[in-house]
Structure formats: C-alpha cells, structure tokens
Swiss-Prot record:
SUPFAM superfamilies: Nucleic acid-binding proteins. PROSITE patterns: S1_IF1_TYPE. Component of the 30S ribosomal translation pre-initiation complex which assembles on the 30S ribosome in the order IF-2 and IF-3, IF-1 and N-formylmethionyl-tRNA(fMet); mRNA recruitment can occur at any time during PIC assembly. The lineage of its organism: Bacteria, Pseudomonadati, Pseudomonadota, Alphaproteobacteria, Acetobacterales. CDD domains: S1_IF1. This is Translation initiation factor IF-1. One of the essential components for the initiation of protein synthesis. Stabilizes the binding of IF-2 and IF-3 on the 30S subunit to which N-formylmethionyl-tRNA(fMet) subsequently binds. Helps modulate mRNA selection, yielding the 30S pre-initiation complex (PIC). Upon addition of the 50S ribosomal subunit IF-1, IF-2 and IF-3 are released leaving the mature 70S translation initiation complex. It is found in: Cytoplasm. GO terms for molecular function: ribosome binding; rRNA binding; translation initiation factor activity. NCBIfam families: infA. Gene3D superfamilies: Nucleic acid-binding proteins. Keywords: Cytoplasm, Initiation factor, Protein biosynthesis, RNA-binding, rRNA-binding. One of its GO terms (cellular component) is cytosol. Belongs to the IF-1 family.
Amino acid sequence: MSKEDLIEFTGTVMELLPNAMFRVTLDNEHTILAHTSGKMRKNRIRVLAGDRVNVEMTPYDLSKGRITFRFK
C-alpha cells in the first residue's frame, strides 16, 4: 500500500489503553483505536489524554489507525 492510499484525520486522544493503544475521537465525531507510529516510538514522543493528533487510516479498516503527529 502506498502513501497515497492513506486517509489522514485530526482528532483528540480520549483514553490511554494497554499496549500503547489509544482511543481517539476524530473531528467528524467517529471514535477509533490507534497506535503510535514507529518514528514516534523511536523518538519517545509521549501522547497523553487530551492531546490533538494526526491519524492515518487505510480505506480498508476505518476503525483503526496510526498516530503520526502530536500537535503542541
């Protein structure tokens, strides 16, 4: 799958779950399950409840996503 196939949304982290998973509410009021991207893990970027984030999702499963950016 290429980068062009991914869909990007902006949302807010609502809840921290085990195994580095997060419940994120998107701006369009949908709630998804998301995990942090590899570069965010490598650079030890912390994501807390209430943070605004960018989420990438595939068109095949719109209930899961990957957090790629945390806004300041």
